Regions:
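Conserved PLP-binding active-site segment of the aspartate aminotransferase-like
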Residues: 335, 410-415, 432-471
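Short beta-strand "wing" residues that participate in macromolecule-binding interfaces
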Residues: 67-68, 175, 433-435
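Short beta-strand
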Residues: 66-68, 399-404, 438
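Conserved active-site segment immediately N-terminal to the catalytic lysine
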Residues: 300-320, 341-344, 446
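Conserved core of the PLP fold type I
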Residues: 147-281, 293-294, 299-310, 462
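Conserved core segment of the aminotransferase class I/II
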Residues: 315-379
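Conserved glycine-rich beta-strand-loop-beta hairpin in the small C-terminal domain of fold type I
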Residues: 363, 379-389, 399-412
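N-terminal basic, amphipathic alpha-helical segments
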Residues: 1-140, 344, 348-354, 424, ...
Length: 474
């Protein structure tokens, strides 16, 4: 059962952890079974008891083992024995509220936007003229009172039904209505999850760079973020596993479709492997999927959602806010029914429940012509992306990551980094972009919102990017 440790292959205690985990997964150690004594394990691994204790303590902190005073260490029967695959022990914690905190750079952007010739490629919304033309229903007060009777703790029932039908038809989702909670946008959904899942000071792994670093809600909940680099297929799982072991990661947040800010799409294999890794360590996944509606390719050719691979251990966050503008915040969470009820309770306690007016308006979005309107938006975005990629093909300095959907493009270069001084100078000269250091990583990259470009603005964009290239090469 136990193999001698190879001291040349990394920390001894981590190799011990891996062997114990594999024996649990293979069934050599059953749920509730007592492990050999520390002395016997030290002899089996040919190491000292101090190293054994460290490995066992780490596994206890991860929830894999339990300790009984005077009796030894046991495989966690609650987590590993009750279900065929380990399910997450979701916990309730309802505390702080979320308040947005603006930084100095965003304040400069706000001031610069008052100038008529300012090219705003920083903002996170599409321009109003691209938003679908939705006709909202007119209701009398008596009708509103009648509709209000259809409100549940999970949301306005007709809206819940529409979202369920849409996700089932478009993305082949399979879930019951009691597994969906309507929220005030995607950010509130994430906030509720953090409040229910984590304790103050807990660690969360995110992709790096990531827009999650821009959200003040992590500060509000006392969450510590650990950035995990990405390669062409998505989040680096080898580095993620080391971070789970070292930093006691309690949740993994990913943005797998048209990742913000890079626009990358996580490969199907990487999604499968991510689920396996997080099952191994009993770490829940939060899948933030607010851009999947804006794919430039057919759904059949896109990777399946991470949630569909492991519905019990993955929480899925979706949103209509990108398509309705910042004034109409609509989002949802899909997950295990017991957790959804707890999230609904938290939402109610914190008075975050949505008004009936907003939910009726959102329900109107899912009319029969919605698919056609959404297709029009996608076509317009794809045309704009082609303008940008055509510009990129002529570049010797800037590179643009391939654009497959969404409305963000990630522009990189070799050489000098985008300092705060250069970014400020660009704003002063009429160009607003989002530098990589806003997303938790100081790399040579900027995010641009290409939905705000057109033929005329591309000319201005090309000129100002040429000026930026000069500053970066100076």
């Amino acid at each position: 059962m136990w193999k001698e440790i190879d001291k040349t292959k990394g920390p001894i205690y981590r190799q011990m952890m891996d062997q114990i985990m594999k024996n649990i997964e293979n069934g050599n150690l059953a749920p509730g079974e007592r492990l050999p004594s520390e002395r016997k394990l030290a002899a089996a691994f040919r190491t000292n008891r101090t190293t054994v204790v460290r490995a066992l303590d780490e596994l206890r902190d991860l929830g894999v083992l339990t300790s009984r005073q005077g009796s030894g260490r046991y495989v966690n029967q609650t987590e590993w024995g009750k279900f065929s695959v380990p399910r997450i022990n979701w916990r309730e914690l309802f505390s702080q509220r979320y308040e947005q905190v603006d930084d100095w750079y965003e304040e400069r952007i706000k001031e610069a936007k008052k100038q008529p010739d300012f090219l705003d490629l920083f903002s996170s919304e599409m321009p109003n003229k691209l938003l679908p033309d939705v006709q909202f229903p007119a209701h009398t007060m008596a009708e509103m009172i009648t509709e209000e009777q259809k409100m549940t703790d999970l949301g306005y029932l007709p809206l819940v039904e529409k979202i369920e039908g849409y996700l089932s038809d478009e993305f082949q989702f399979d879930f019951s209505r009691t597994q969906l909670l309507v929220t005030v946008g995607g950010q509130q959904a994430i906030f509720l999850i953090l409040q229910t899942l984590l304790s103050n000071g807990d660690a969360v792994a995110v992709e790096s760079p990531s827009f999650f670093y821009r959200l003040a809600l992590f500060r509000a909940t006392g969450t510590r973020l650990f950035g995990i680099p990405m390669d062409d297929e998505g989040i680096d799982l080898a580095i993620l596993e080391k971070s789970i072991q070292k930093n006691k990661i309690k949740a993994v947040l990913v943005n797998p479709n048209f990742q913000n800010p890079t626009g990358k799409v996580m490969s199907q294999k990487r999604r499968n492997d991510l689920v396996v890794l997080c099952r191994k360590y009993q770490v829940p996944i939060v899948e933030d999927d607010v851009f999947s509606d804006l794919s430039f390719q057919e759904v059949e050719k896109s990777p399946v959602s991470i949630h569909s691979l492991d519905p019990e251990n993955v929480l899925y966050v979706g949103s209509l806010s990108r398509l309705l503008g910042k004034t109409t915040k609509i989002g949802w969470i899909i997950g295990p029914q017991t957790l959804i009820f707890k999230l609904a309770k938290a939402q109610k306690m914190m008075e975050f429940s949505m008004s009936i007016f907003t939910q009726i308006a959102a329900t109107a979005v899912f009319e029969e012509s919605y698919d056609a309107k959404l297709a029009l938006v996608r076509n317009q975005l794809q045309e704009k992306s082609l303008l940008l990629q055509k510009w990129a093909q002529k570049q010797n300095f800037f590179n643009v990551w391939p654009i497959k959907g969404g409305y963000y493009a990630w522009v990189t270069w070799e050489g000098k980094k985008m300092t705060a001084e250069i970014a400020s100078e660009a704003v002063a000269k009429g160009l607003g972009v989002a530098p990589s250091w806003l997303f938790g990583r100081e790399t040579n990259g900027i995010r641009i919102n290409f939905s705000r470009l057109d033929q005329d603005r591309m000319i201005v964009f090309a000129k100002r990017m040429e000026e930026l290239a000069g500053w970066l090469q100076a």
